[in-house]
Amino acid sequence: MRFATCDLCDAHKNDLSGDFRVLPPVFRDFGGRPAFAGPVAVVKCHEDNSLVKDAVDSPGQGRVLVVDGGGSLRRALVGGNLAAAAARNGWAGLVVDGCVRDVAELRACDVGIRALAAMPLPTEKRQQGQRDVPVWIQGVLVQPGDWLYADEDGIVLSRRPLHG
């Protein structure tokens, strides 16, 4: 699928319905795919990546996993093992409102990864969190089933597919 977030923004800049949204430019690129898109699945967790692991171990089917880590910079929610699982299981990308680790390994994975920062400290494993719930990422509503488009210029969301 070919797209450019700038073109999507040009086409939808007057959409005041809330169906088209743009995440703030705070996410860094860590993955092996500079551009990715797909329907959204959601994990909400705080410094515990147990549900992230469960998600990426399941078939991704071209989806994008949005991880609401509350913007925490204290623990890494995704590392090399989880990124490799995401690539192996067909996830298009991961957007983490939090940290990642194993940066060289992430870059080698064929999956898009955006996150706030790198942090070498791993998470706790308490099986806490929620899946497939609406979340607020950096002040922007993200819902399961939204479409997410990410490239070098940014990340946009829509309630419906915008490509094709």
Residue ranges of each PLM-predicted region?
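Feature captures the catalytic cores and cofactor-binding loops of soluble hydro-lyases/lyases
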Residues: 1-144, 161-164
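Mixed-charge, glycine-accented linear interaction segment located at domain edges/termini
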Residues: 143, 147-158
